[in-house]
From Swiss-Prot:
The chain crosses the membrane at residues 102-122, 157-177. This is Isoprenylcysteine alpha-carbonyl methylesterase ICME. Keywords: Endoplasmic reticulum, Golgi apparatus, Hydrolase, Membrane, Transmembrane, Transmembrane helix. Substrate binds at residues 163-165, 234-236. It holds the Pfam family BD-FAE. It is a multi-pass membrane protein. Plants overexpressing ICME exhibit enhanced ABA inhibition of seed germination and ABA induction of stomatal closure. Plant silencing ICME exhibit a reduced ABA sensitivity in seed germination assays. Expressed in roots, rosette and cauline leaves, stems, flowers and siliques. InterPro entries: AB_hydrolase_fold, BD-FAE-like_dom, Carboxylesterase_B_AS, GDXG_lipolytic_enzyme.
Length: 427
């Protein structure tokens, strides 16, 4: 990679938290499981090799019950999202820009549909995907886990916060990344969180922080290494994750009660993120996310400073808390017009100015969707993917060896459709 940052092994281990354990047990058991852990007096199941024929009957019943729960949950979420969509339309009113974006988004999705269908099939039917694990008590406080196929030791973990303009984010948007990283022996936890108008930015940051806490305190029950947890966000998710990380560091500096610490995060990866709301509000307005909506999402202009990580670093207390942050690597395409790459440049400068370990990686000619969608769907070599994996496996010689021998990722969408999608992408 472009001189990847070296990270130190944190000394603090993650210990089990005491919430939503029954929900973990509902979704975790599979054909390769064994009772090994107790949280809050209830058994969890740790993934191990081997099967027990005696358990086949209960497992069959469980799978039937799990399918029923999935159907019920899907119906409930569909009803919820439909209602929120109509509420959002009332906020948006009639506007040329956002209607044009909606039409472009529809065409964009249709062009990439061959790849989306393949990913969706794996998402719903792969045994390596654990969907909708509850991590909190608020709506959409759920996460998806993408697990490697082998169980030879504890795996590094990526907590991923999806993008979606703070409005259309959903945990399944990270499914392609999750599946591809799982092929490299990396567990991925894709967080869902309340979007606008169901919640505003403070709700989103709270949800993300609670999801990170859940992973830190429970991932060992799923075969994850609690001392090798990486945080990643994309687009709006990068902004939300950065806010959560900086807020947690500030709380830690002040000695406040916390359920996870920034020292438990090995590194933060920010992909195509925006970190200064003052500079983004007019930019988004011109691209169809109208100023009135943006102000509603961000709880008014008076909250811009609080939710602008770049600006917050100017506060002496927050600047001091930045010394607690893990190494930060910001990735951005130089041709990103949705969120200009200057957002990552100036945030990197601000972090370095207060002594934080920060690095910027720019990809020449790449757009907002090239890095996260078109390139992964194209298959073969992918600079961003290789850069992320090289950091995660930097201290794992076996992992680096396996990476060098890994077969090229398969193409999911024909090149012609990818080029057309790039031209009409609304992002």
């Amino acid at each position: 990679m472009h001189s990847p940052l070296q990270t130190q092994q944190p000394e603090q281990r993650c210990w089990p938290m005491t919430s939503t354990v029954s929900e973990i047990e509902e979704v975790l058991p599979d054909e390769d499981s064994d009772r090994t852990t107790l949280l809050n007096g209830e058994p969890l199941r740790r993934r191990v090799s081997g099967k027990s024929p005696v358990d086949e009957g209960p497992r069959r019943i469980f799978r039937q019950q799990s399918f029923g729960r999935d159907i019920g949950h899907a119906a409930a979420e569909t009803y919820l999202i439909t209602g929120l969509s109509f509420k959002l339309l009332r906020y948006l009113g009639v506007g040329y820009r956002w209607m044009t974006k909606l039409l472009a988004l529809t065409c964009y999705a249709m062009l990439l549909m061959p790849g989306f269908l393949q990913v969706a099939y794996s998402y719903f039917f792969s045994k390596q995907v654990r969907r909708s694990i509850v991590y909190g008590d608020q709506p959409r406080n759920r996460l998806d886990l993408y697990l490697p196929s082998n169980n030879d030791g504890l795996k590094p973990v990526v907590v991923f916060v999806t993008g979606g303009a703070w409005i259309i984010g959903y945990k399944a948007w990270g499914s392609l990344l999750g599946m591809q990283l799982a092929e490299r022996d990396i567990i991925v936890a894709c967080l869902d969180y309340r979007n606008f108008p169901q919640g505003t930015i403070s709700d989103m940051v709270t949800d993300a922080s609670q999801g990170i806490s859940f992973v830190c305190n429970n991932i060992s029950a799923f075969g994850g290494d609690p001392n090798r947890i990486y945080l990643m966000g994309q687009s709006a998710g990068a902004h939300i994750a950065a806010c959560a990380l900086l807020e947690q560091a500030t709380k830690e500096l002040k000695g406040e009660s916390i359920s996870w610490t920034v020292s438990q995060i090995k590194a933060y990866f920010g992909l195509s993120g925006g970190y200064n709301l003052y500079k983004l509000v007019d930019h988004f307005h011109n691209r169809g996310l109208y100023r009135s909506i943006f102000l509603s999402i961000m709880e008014g202009e008076e909250s811009f400073e609080k939710f602008s990580p770049e600006v917050r670093l100017k506060d002496p207390v927050v600047g001091k808390a930045a010394s607690l942050l893990p190494p930060i690597i910001l990735f951005h395409g130089s041709s990103d017009y949705s969120i200009p790459c200057d957002e990552s440049k100036t945030f990197t400068d601000a972090l370095q100015a207060v002594g934080a370990k920060a690095e910027l990686v720019l990809y020449s000619g790449k757009t907002h969707t090239d890095l996260f969608l078109q390139d992964p769907l194209r298959g073969g070599k992918d600079e961003l993917f290789d850069d992320i994996v090289s950091v995660i496996h930097a201290e794992d010689n076996d992992g680096l060896t396996k990476d060098s021998l890994a077969p090229p990722r398969k193409r999911l969408v024909p090149e012609l459709l990818l080029k057309l999608a790039r031209e009409i992408s609304p992002f």
